[in-house]
Design a protein with these regions (language model features):
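PP2C/PPM-type serine/threonine phosphatase catalytic domain
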Residues: 1-324
Length: 324
């Protein structure tokens, strides 16, 4: 997040990261014809326009950790709400896109934390060989509401007949978006997974964890295994995946291999390099964003783009929670 031009990589590429960290985004559009594509594209464009150096400087220059987190929460929440409003307005202007909407999940990795903001049922997970597997987001869905109310056992939620019914999204003209936010302290060898319900709606968390655990040293294979797992059980929805590997500093001496280049560690940064494996749907613009390299940056990110599996869309309903 260091320059004004945003790019999508076409081949394996090492991205240096500056003081603004890196941003991971998944937006899973919904609606008839191409309306879902339009909604997710608007959401991504809104996020892109929000993450400018001028706006980010006001946050990253804060020295108080509590003030920084509060500022980031406000910033991400406002960005998601702005995307919601832009989608609603676009729907009013073009009748062919009425009813369009999108989920969104954002992970902003900055300094020694990940800041997560989401609306809908696209998820953010983190895996660490030492600390295990954790879902960092919480679905905005009818089934999750039943679990929260004690009306449904968590182990029965996955197979519930209404597990695709969401209660929040971007683009609903009758209900303004209400995103949630949380932060997470980074650990060495954390692997982040952002995904649409095309993966987590078909594969149990335990299966996702097992695939990441077995392939944590080769996330390209990991990506393939996750997609294959979703397809093996039906694959009725688009599968969008973002994988991000956090690597702690190993040495101050640069290595010869560009893919493993190590830069000197900033004094206030524990984690020196982030390896990003971004697997998204470029056509829908719903998977990920990151900025053009800044050569003077202290961190590096390794990008491995790939195709996202596209299947025939199924309807995703949006409702307000109702008593059971």
């Amino acid at each position: 997040l260091s320059q004004s031009e945003w790019i999508i990589p076409q081949s394996s590429e090492t991205i240096p990261l500056g003081k603004y960290g890196t941003l991971l985004v998944v937006a899973d559009g919904m609606g008839g014809t191409n309306a879902g594509e339009v909604a997710s594209a608007i959401a991504i464009e809104t996020v892109q326009n929000a993450f400018t150096p001028e706006k980010l400087d006001k946050i990253v220059t804060l020295e108080d950790e509590m003030a920084t987190e509060e500022a980031i929460e406000e910033f991400l929440t406002k960005t998601v709400k702005a995307a919601d409003l832009n989608i609603v307005n676009a729907s009013k202007e073009d009748s062919s896109t009425q009813g369009m909407g999108t989920t969104i999940v954002i992970a902003w990795i900055l300094n020694e934390k990940a800041y997560i903001c989401w609306c809908g049922d696209s998820r953010c997970y983190v895996f660490n060989a030492n600390s295990g597997f954790c879902r960092l987001s919480k679905d905005h869905s009818y089934v999750q509401d039943l679990v929260d109310q004690g009306k449904l056992d968590p182990e029965n939620a996955f197979d519930h007949p209404y597990n695709n019914v969401i209660t929040r999204c971007l683009g609903d003209p009758t209900n303004r978006s209400n995103p949630d936010f949380r932060s997470y302290n980074l650990k060495d060898d954390d692997i982040f997974l952002l995904c649409s319900d095309g993966l987590c709606g078909l594969c149990h968390d335990e299966e996702i964890m097992q695939i990441i655990e077995e392939n944590q040293n080769d996330l390209v294979v990991c990506k393939d295994q996750l997609i294959e797992a979703a397809l093996a059980v039906g694959g009725y929805d688009n599968v969008t995946i973002v994988l991000c590997h956090i690597i702690q500093k190993e040495t101050d001496e640069p290595k010869a291999n560009l893919n493993n280049t190590v830069f000197s560690k900033p004094n206030n940064h524990k984690f020196r390099k982030i390896v990003l494996l971004l697997f998204v749907l470029a056509v829908l613009l719903g998977g990920y964003l990151y900025k053009k390299p800044q050569l003077s940056a202290k961190w590096k990110a390794k990008i491995f783009p790939t195709d996202t599996v596209i299947v025939t869309e199924t309807d995703t309903s949006t409702i307000s929670p109702q008593p059971d």
